[in-house]
């Protein structure tokens, strides 16, 4: 088949004309989907290897999610005024999250519509807590991490540093730079530098720390080093700094656990944020926090948080992911990916591989080659049964995050196609070198 086809080209043209300029790059348009397989408006098929940056962890057209949506629609309640009176499904979801998450107990939950909103709520909780404690002028600083990503709304732009020239620089009044501290992410390579920078800080002036765990996603799937992380935790904890853990891309089974940071039994966040896969494709965000950090009445609220459809689906997602974890399915995906990707270690187009659970990155020599690999993957369906839906991460990496429900056969096909795409890229690059 031709890619992009006639219908796809028409929609892409209309998008350029009528939709705002955002981050859209892919030419793969989803007309229908089934687990890991996407079909576009022209009938081309693709294997999804990034799940909408970790949203569709249970794949597309998941029967459990479809059934949950249908069951809620049959009640006639699509919107409940959860800001005005409790919605039973939102309370059930909150109870489950509060009871099982690693946040210090007792804990509470605030539901919203996205990861950015979840992180905004986390920031507001910390600031309100310091305000009521009479510490707003004493603890006014915040620790963030280089190459981090916390969302695109104004309040969390200070913590979003993965591509500041486009994410932050146009919004010149976006944060108080003097009160934002940027540390290297706690990897083994950064351990000594991180210790040095921590020793130079007046930690008594710091309100909060926001960190993605167990790895940075948008930065290029950068796993934290546990020893370095534990040192950071100990030093900042003893200084009274509030810990916000962002498990938005890493959570809901992606690294083999529900909350991502529960890989570290010694870590007890004050606040934990979730979104993406929690909603099974529907908008949702969750901010789980120590109960004593709670707002005073009226200090924070929203219109659509605790939506009954999203809440019912989230309960279903949590149950399904628990089953996948218990069955060893996610571990098998991790082992299969490790085994196949290890064979690429000497490939001329591969500079590095890293990951955890079902969340991996392959780093290429530069951004141009990475972007060309994405195009090659999309175009493979013209000669193969499937093309590949790939997504970049960081400056020059590809993230590989298949659905946690992907069949062994489809995963094998996808990894075979990925190797073929790398080989095509290698051949193109060699030909370019010869011609120049």
Language-model segments: which ranges?
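Conserved N-terminal phosphate-binding loop of PLP-dependent enzymes in the Aspartate aminotransferase
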Residues: 1-436
